[in-house]
């Protein structure tokens, strides 16, 4: 009779809930074996749910592939709402059929997993481009236009020209065919990939700014108007990376602070 350790090793090789191994092991009444079976089944059930989620997020991509499109770029941005720092956009072309576990809208991914998923996207992507527009440009042209410019910059930095664009709720001035998707980062894997690249890139920039401009909590709040950030503004005033057309900074500038 196989030891519990051997049974556990065997179960680790099972990758389907339909495997005949389950019926074979069901006859083994040892508590350790039954616990190992329960644990492995739960793991596979969780993987099946994740596979189904990823498959659903490839709906737009698969439709385009079926129509002969080869290279699809997902485009998304991070940083439209903060009071400080740039808006960052990313464009990502994933290989056909690529599934990256736990890739989702970056806002739904635990921060502890950001870096690992970012690295996997960077390793597996056909091409990645990043566009960055600073606070000065945001103040000059407005955040909506700056976001579009960041997206176009990211698109222009791709080493492979895409045949079609999937964009999160935006339309770009480009001859490349495009599809604008509401909540695209939660409904398209390509856009989700762009979302995590933009998020990690911007978070790293804000962490660097935190060292340069201490007292605002940029490493933690990424430039959003948290209590710590607002207190820093009141005590220290504005920095060169603050958006002067955003309140309350706009009023502070008008008041001479």
Swiss-Prot record:
Keywords: Cytoplasm, Endonuclease, Hydrolase, Manganese, Metal-binding, Nuclease
Sample GO molecular function, one term: RNA-DNA hybrid ribonuclease activity
Recorded superkingdom: Bacteria
Cofactor: how and how many bound: Manganese or magnesium. Binds 1 divalent metal ion per monomer in the absence of substrate. May bind a second metal ion after substrate binding.
Cell compartments where the protein resides: Cytoplasm
CDD domains the record matches: RNase_HII_bacteria_HII_like
GO biological process: DNA replication, removal of RNA primer; mismatch repair
InterPro entries on file: RNase_HII, RNase_HII/HIII, RNase_HII/HIII_dom, RNaseH-like_sf, RNaseH_sf
Name this polypeptide is given: Ribonuclease HII
Gene designation: rnhB
């Amino acid at each position: 009779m196989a030891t519990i350790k051997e049974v556990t090793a065997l179960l680790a090789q099972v990758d389907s809930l339909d495997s005949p191994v389950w019926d074979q092991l069901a006859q083994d009444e040892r508590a350790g074996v039954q616990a190992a079976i329960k644990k492995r089944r739960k793991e596979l059930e969780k993987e099946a749910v994740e596979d189904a989620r990823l498959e659903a997020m490839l709906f737009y991509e698969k439709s385009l592939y079926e129509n002969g499109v080869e290279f699809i770029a997902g485009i998304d941005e991070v940083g439209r709402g903060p009071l400080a720092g740039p808006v960052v956009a990313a464009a990502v072309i994933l290989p056909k059929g690529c599934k990256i576990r736990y890739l989702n809208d970056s806002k739904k991914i635990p921060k502890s997993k950001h870096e690992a998923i970012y690295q996997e996207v960077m390793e597996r992507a056909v091409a990645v481009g990043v566009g960055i527009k600073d606070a000065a440009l945001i103040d000059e042209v407005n955040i909506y236009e700056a976001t579009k410019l960041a997206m176009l910059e990211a698109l222009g930095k791709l080493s492979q020209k895409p045949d079609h664009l999937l964009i999160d709720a935006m339309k770009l001035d480009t001859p490349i065919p495009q599809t604008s998707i509401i909540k695209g980062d939660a409904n398209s894997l390509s856009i989700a990939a762009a979302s995590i690249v933009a998020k990690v890139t911007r978070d790293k920039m804000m962490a660097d700014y935190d060292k340069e401009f201490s007292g605002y909590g940029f490493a933690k709040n990424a430039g959003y108007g948290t209590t710590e950030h607002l207190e820093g503004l009141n005590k220290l005033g504005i920095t060169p990376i603050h958006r002067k057309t955003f309140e309350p900074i706009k009023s502070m500038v008008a008041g001479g602070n």
